[in-house]
Amino acid sequence: MVAIIVHGGAGTIKKEERIPKVIEGVKEAVIVGWKELRKGSALDAVEEAIKVLEDNPIFNAGTGSVLTIDGKVEMDAAIMRGKTLEAGAVAGIWGVKNPISVARKVMEKTDHVLLVGEGAVKFARLMGFPEYNPITEERIEQWKELKEKLMKGEIKYWKKLGELIKEYPEVLRSTVGAVAFDGEEIVAGTSTGGVFLKMFGRVGDTPIIGAGTYANEVAGASCTGLGEVAIRLALAKTATDFVRLGMDAQAASNAAISLATKYFGKDTMGIIMVDAAGNVGFAKNTKHMSYAYMKDGMEEPEAGV
């Protein structure tokens, strides 16, 4: 039983007219991933699905990543193989089109797991990734609007981030991710531009193995939402532990989000999972989380928010 699931991020989609575009985006990604999965590689499926999401400016990853407090882009990404526990990640990278592909190169071409900032950019250039500007006009306008609110005192920037997000849900934007099982191996991957108005140098859960991204021989998980929550709970690894204890992917997803809600409240997290039986799971405590999945026996993806 093979399966793949993708997400386009947890949070609140303020403009209802964006929802069909978001659903179409995750469906497109899962179809591309499914085609790769049918060729036999969960690793290729996860990378290619996430690249589709990174290239779609409606999502907060790659092209269309949100801006830091000083108006720049700093992106995070990670990918992990469940069979070997190999992993690669980049944090605070800029000037590349597909951070997930750079993360894969970290996994395959180095002895390291995580490269950050200028080091990640230099590595990307060594690997042949060309200079690319992922900033879009829409993100610039959103940044200007939020920065104006900040300057007027409407947003108290030094408040706890969770409180800020409750008042201004537009600050929290969508991470993207994918998890796949090819019949032999589970692979998980995640990519994000982070949180709007984040401090320069801030790193979320996405590139932290075990927090936002994790895979082993029993399950894989990709998290989305307020990264600091996933880091404190080691949420992706915790979710796979639930599977090891006997839950399927859906029950483990529910348990992971219940844990996040218990400690940090609602409107904080979402998760997607696949287990080694080919079951998919997804859960959230936010208003929305776009997702799409396909598995054996399905001709069209199941998708929603």
Curated annotation (Swiss-Prot):
Belongs to the Ntn-hydrolase family. One of its GO terms (biological process) is proteolysis. It catalyses: L-asparagine + H2O = L-aspartate + NH4(+). Its EC number is 3.5.1.1. Heterotetramer of two alpha and two beta chains arranged as a dimer of alpha/beta heterodimers. It comes from the Archaea. It comes from Pyrococcus horikoshii (strain ATCC 700860 / DSM 12428 / JCM 9974 / NBRC 100139 / OT-3). Catalyzes the hydrolysis of L-asparagine into L-aspartate and ammonia. This is Plant-type L-asparaginase. InterPro entries: Ntn_hydrolases_N (IPR029055), Peptidase_T2 (IPR000246). GO terms for cellular component: cytoplasm. Keywords: Autocatalytic cleavage, Hydrolase, Protease. Substrate binds at R202, V203, G204, D205, T224, G225, L226, G227. Autocleaved. Generates the alpha and beta subunits. The N-terminal residue of the beta subunit is thought to be responsible for the nucleophile hydrolase activity. The active site is at T175. The record marks S174, T175 as: Cleavage. GO terms for molecular function: asparaginase activity; peptidase activity.
